[in-house]
Regions:
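Short glycine-/small-residue motifs
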Residues: 103, 156
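Extracytoplasmic/periplasmic sensor domains and loops in membrane signaling proteins
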Residues: 76-77, 105-138
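Juxtamembrane segments flanking the first transmembrane helix
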Residues: 6-99, 105-108, 125, 168, ...
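Selective recognition of signaling/oligomerization transmembrane alpha-helices
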Residues: 174-189
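Short hydrophobic/aromatic beta-strand element in the GNAT-like acyltransferase core
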Residues: 90, 130, 140, 144
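Helix-start (N-cap) segments at beta->loop->alpha junctions
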Residues: 148-150, 158-178
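A short beta-strand signature within small-molecule sensing/ligand-binding domains used
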Residues: 136-148, 155
Length: 189
């Protein structure tokens, strides 16, 4: 019993086992890095791209409303009629109190109701706001900007985009990296 215990201790203390375990640890660390870093960088690039695109789309709407001294359903609808469709899932325009004056959603429209999405609240406080999240196979991006008339906030424009296309590309990248990692792990072991 003592002899088998000392053989096990000698086995774990041998230089070959230490090198082997070190090799496995290095390969595991490289595979972990390979599976996380490119995905994080890609996700960050998608977030930045979405912010740039959506902020630009909202700026076009804000610019079309900027000449109005106050916002109401009629003049907002007239101004929005000339704004080109920007590929957004939803656009809301509110007055300075958060009352929705315009909503592109056809069913369940929020026109005539108050909305307090955090991005709209920030816009009504004078800030541009953007948020983006990735879950359940889709990017959900939201942005809002204040509408100003003579340096006075008269409302806000909010845009929402639900995007599964870029999410599918990111999931495809993740799948390819996992397959590549499995192949490398199989070749190494």
């Amino acid at each position: 019993d003592k002899a088998s215990k000392s053989r096990r201790m000698a086995l774990w203390g041998s230089l070959q086992v230490k090198f082997g375990l070190s090799y496995i640890a290095v390969i595991a660390a490289v595979l972990l890095l390979l599976n996380t870093y490119p995905l994080l960088v890609s996700e960050d690039l998608v977030f930045r791209s979405k912010e740039t695109n959506m902020t630009g789309s909202v700026s076009v709407v804000v610019y079309s409303l900027a000449g109005l001294n106050r916002l109401n359903q009629e003049n907002v609808a007239a101004a929005m009629a000339v704004v080109e469709e920007t590929g957004l899932s939803r656009v809301l325009v509110t007055d300075s109190a958060g009352l929705v004056l315009y909503d592109t959603r056809e069913t369940g429209s929020a026109v005539g109701k108050y909305t307090f999405y955090s991005e709209i609240v920030q816009a009504l406080e004078g800030y541009d706001a953007f948020s983006c999240s990735y879950r359940d196979g889709a990017f959900r991006s939201r942005t809002a900007s204040p509408v100003l008339y003579q340096n006075r906030i008269i409302g806000a424009v909010y845009a929402y985009k639900y995007d599964t296309e870029q999410a599918a590309l990111l999931e495809g990248l993740q799948s390819n990296l996992l397959k590549l990692s499995a192949g490398i792990a199989a070749a190494v072991v």
